[in-house]
A protein has these predicted regions:
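Short, basic/aromatic recognition patches that contact phosphate-bearing ligands
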Residues: 1-74
Length: 74
């Protein structure tokens, strides 16, 4: 899986789960925890409000919704 696909999948996973650890994410995506930290930072830099609780995991801040995406035929 390339990085773009993984970051989008990570966002969707965070959207469907309450809390998830970096370790479980690294196991799920078969990458290092360091890679997960970089992917989380990428999402945060894109404006996604990700919260973190030490020893508990990552989560999307309450009330965040994925923005709608529109495609054209062009």
């Amino acid at each position: 899986m390339n990085r773009f696909d993984r970051v989008i999948s990570l966002l969707l996973l965070l959207h469907t789960r309450a809390v998830v650890t970096a370790r479980s994410l690294s196991d799920h995506f078969d990458v290092s925890e360091r890679t997960i930290y970089r992917d989380i930072r990428t999402l945060e830099n894109a404006g996604v409000p990700i919260g973190a609780e030490p020893g508990i995991g990552y989560f999307l801040e309450q009330g965040y919704r994925l923005p709608p995406v529109s495609f054209t035929l062009d």
